[in-house]
């Protein structure tokens, strides 16, 4: 996955287009689509928020139908959430417009919106933009990955090639990483592998739990968060196990990229939990550590304050045996049933790097889980203190 | 409750003492006790953390026995959490030492520790301090309220007098207010009202849910969080309903004081939820708003970003009907089933004050709930980025 980003192309049969339609006040690219020339098997997971946006609600309905997909249209700048019936109509109109230009069914197009909540889409700009989008279709992935960004400081791509030549290309966006109620996160994966939709959908929730949700924490919880994988089968039959393992690798790579690009972040925070009673408890404990403002602040200050790990694990509700619990910071054991003597200055020095890793053994079982976050900086506050006004 | 703080005394039959025992490196007061000359009926609630500290575990055992209390001993500076068997022994020794000097049973003394997690108590200092504490017993409440502080910037007291002359005096500490895994919070109330212990214990959980837990969010979740009320009956029979209402008022006052003194806080954040399906959902929605770093950052910047309220409510899982939902900021309606036109500059100006209030109607029922938090400032990060090293 070291190929220079500008050269990454979508898998065969997929093309994408991006443009500046004027939705973002900045004039940056804000409207984009990915189109498949063949029907796609697909899997999807959307936010569990009770105030989910129109795009999530509509996609979920299409998902339930089980019918194949042909395209995805995304706008950035306006989330079209909490916009009532008008918002639902606008969202459907955005999909219909692309379907019409592509001459596919409107139910073959899913949508995704991200940006400020509570504003209606500027439909004149959206519709005239969508009308011209397909003229720009090309194989390159970077323009799409860039057009879906909001407060992200860099585009997020990950890709892999399977043994039969099939490829998986993933893109993601999301930067407000401090908490589940963050700015919207998307993760999309496109593949020319041929996979059975039932098998894909059966495996997808567990993959999402270990990747996308391991940065969102507490499940999918913004109004617009979503992740989807589209498989058009152009590369022919693909070993399912190999495919799913590779898909998880791409999703995991994207999840880490999102965490590392958290608003105001200077370091990636990785928490690896072992010795848990179940994978769910391991993931829950790891996520609770990654979302803790106290631990995140400590990581920012390169402070090996492992007491905050103990506290966050306790808060997560995961079963622990404190007397058998172990904690390491950057590989240095600091707690084993009780405080250990260690060189705090040296550990602090080792934390002044791009990634800080806490290993935590709960001492009760054999399940494991990993989650990612970022440090909390003063910059986070200044980014978010004045976003709309 | 406007009496100058230095003049507040404990209810009759209670006296307190505080001293600097050398537990805090700063040399500030860090060891204190409250003693009742009569047996106290009591109620208690401790953290639900799975890594609860020794003091919480021991108090819970005493609570289960139902036997009366005579004293509370508190140290600040070291939380004595994640300290294993040695920590449990030290905690019991601290209680035993005070019981011995007071000539009461060791099971009549509860303990509370707050400060850095994972350090053992300096028992030589604690024990020699406890030995001399009772020499300093006096009626004033402020020295005790001050000695239990850690990162608090001010002491927290609230008191009320009932119609029969009985009084309730409450003290609290807690400042790391951004999240449930905050630094430890205590709230203690002392009263000379005579109340039935069974009735008190029956009513206490709901009062805690509406007050103490409405700032801690997600229940009691630090390793050492606790709240307790001690009633020694010296003022004689008291109307139970009047007492419970007054107790809730004192606890609510303390909860707001804790929120307003959040680390780095410049404003109190109050979220009042109505129209919920249940009180639990109303409280959950209000708390989720108060803990949202995005909303807290917006409050810091005086940004009426009500979209973050919609998002936080959605994340809380509370039942909502978005088309019937209403949001007001500082009394100005900004959302009613969809975005409303309002003077954003004027509302922003009105947020530049000590308390910012969001009113949120979920549009599904008639239950209500209120929660308190504070804004998120860059100062929070600097306070917490370098706490132990």
From Swiss-Prot, chains A, B:
The keyword Acyltransferase applies. One of its GO terms (biological process) is ornithine biosynthetic process. The record marks 183-184 as: Cleavage. Its EC number is 2.3.1.35, 2.3.1.1. One of its GO terms (cellular component) is cytoplasm. Pathway: Amino-acid biosynthesis; L-arginine biosynthesis; L-ornithine and N-acetyl-L-glutamate from L-glutamate and N(2)-acetyl-L-ornithine (cyclic): step 1/1; Amino-acid biosynthesis; L-arginine biosynthesis; N(2)-acetyl-L-ornithine from L-glutamate: step 1/4. Belongs to the ArgJ family. Heterotetramer of two alpha and two beta chains. This is Arginine biosynthesis bifunctional protein ArgJ. It comes from Deinococcus radiodurans (strain ATCC 13939 / DSM 20539 / JCM 16871 / CCUG 27074 / LMG 4051 / NBRC 15346 / NCIMB 9279 / VKM B-1422 / R1).
